[in-house]
Amino acid sequence: MHPKTDHIEKIITENFRYIRDIKKIEAINHNDINSKNFLIYSKKSKYVLKFLKNNQQKRNKQIQRILYRANQNGIKVSIPIKNESKRKILDDVILSKFYNGKTFSGSVQELESFGYELAKLHKFLKKSKVKLQKDKNIGSYKLLSPKDITRIKKIIGQSSNPNKIDNMVKRRLEFLQQINQRHSEFQKKRKKFDEQLIHNDLHTDNIIFFKKNISVILDFYFMKRGTILEDVSYSALRLSEQTSKNFKNIEKMVNLFINTYSKYNKIHQNELLNLNYFLSKNSLARINHILRNRYFHDSNSWVQQLPLHFKLLDFSYKIKLEV
């Protein structure tokens, strides 16, 4: 075993002693900046070891209990493997089974399978009485104020060496201010929507298929209370964008997935009437988070995803709901 992975093998041998004969440990390349993941090869199976970076032990334990109960209710989620140690380190170190499979390929069968499984998940989460501790970073995803936009513009203007990210942000600031303002006004006057626990991070890497059917839904550590349409619309947009660059095809697939999901779990009409708001909500939050980090906290976390989320934000206000 390589010296760099010796400490990982030690964690496993001390806390998961029933996993024998570790053959190899590899770092997993992924988009989740909130954890560091490793693929563990043993003689009989493969596992994923996740080191959470959020320092929210209570929240992590709450989510793990939710996942255990979901699994017991037949929901296809990845559950932490119970350890044999009471050591504090295990509060933020999660071992789970590795699932073979592929990301979305664009088939109707995959959409049907995921729509059914997501509806089951939402029905289960709706019954949960857990008062989930809020993500401590949630504030960085809030709407940007006109003062924030002005501050970002000033920082870019004063830069002696702006790069292509800065130039892209500068070009989109007026549009971004309009969308943030639109969301702010909507949130002040909107009717109250039904909220429950939702996944809140259903991008393509967290939805795994095997033989065109859902194998597992991964990574629930961004969970929050929200509307089911937030999950449905964001996952529809991410799945659609992965398989086509043509707007009409993306619009068609988003509508197809909403209709597929609705066969198994009703989406309230007042939410559907505001589809563009929900379609744009997640990408706007992520853009705002990235810009706050970059310009206010000197951090480039997730900055590589900025072009994607600007593109999704553009799509969000062009897509029309088919009736």
Show the residue positions of the predicted features.
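A cross-family kinase active-site recognition segment
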Residues: E110-V169
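Conserved NTP-binding catalytic cores of kinases and kinase-like/nucleotidyltransferase enzymes
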Residues: M1-K82, E322-V323
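Active-site activation/catalytic loop segments of kinase-like enzymes and analogous catalytic loops
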Residues: L229-K266, S280-D298
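ATP-binding pocket architecture of kinase catalytic cores
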Residues: S42-Q133
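A glycine-centered beta->alpha junction motif in the catalytic cores
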Residues: D92-G106, K154-Q158, K281-H297
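All-alpha amphipathic helical-bundle segments outside canonical DNA-binding/catalytic cores
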Residues: I267-L279
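ATP/Mg2+ or Mg2+-diphosphate-binding catalytic cores
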Residues: R151, R286-V323
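Active-site acidic catalytic loop and adjacent metal/ATP-binding pocket
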Residues: D32-K43, V48-L49, Q181-E230
